[in-house]
From Swiss-Prot:
GO terms for cellular component: cytoplasm. InterPro entries: Depp_CoAkinase, P-loop_NTPase. Pfam families: CoaE. It is an enzyme of class 2 (transferase). The gene is coaE. This is Dephospho-CoA kinase. GO terms for biological process: coenzyme A biosynthetic process. Pathway: Cofactor biosynthesis; coenzyme A biosynthesis; CoA from (R)-pantothenate: step 5/5. It comes from Rhodopseudomonas palustris (strain HaA2). The keyword Transcription does not apply.
Amino acid sequence: MLVLGLTGSIGMGKSTTAKLFGEAGVPVYDADATVHQIYEGEAVPAIEAAFPGTTVDGKVDRALLSEKVVHDSDAMKRLEQIVHPMLRSHHQNFLDDAEASGAPVAVVDVPLLFETGGEKRVDAVVVVTTSPEVQRERILARENMTPEKLDAILARQMPDAEKRRRADFVVDTSHGLDPVRAQIREILDAAARMPRRRP
């Protein structure tokens, strides 16, 4: 089974692209959805211990947690040390299940793929991109997003140009869904002929 790592900076259209891979019959692992899941379960005690006051009704309150970590790189590192091992375990379970199902290709949707060294654990990388103007417009339309918060998020992410340079495939979401579907078909055709690279 070939594993494609899907990544892209905030607001690039990565979640939509992941859904379209799913529509094409490809198993898709969603790291963000897994974070939501562990924030409602296994990560709660460790996060409350590290960041007191960030849980409400037995769940991590993402807004409260964000206030504690978004401008503090040491706090962000502590959070990652809690969350990343849990995510790796869920990720491996997904791959085992996808392989057992006989899927020829699986997609792992990981926002910080390059930033966490995740490109070494996939066979090829798909980077989702759009113009800076469209990106900013999409992000600032989100609830609870401010220009300052956006700048702090972007400062932690590898620049889009560098991600595109390191990608095996690039999906441009600037022109609507049909062109994205066509790009996905091309990627899946190419992936069928690619050798496995991950260990």
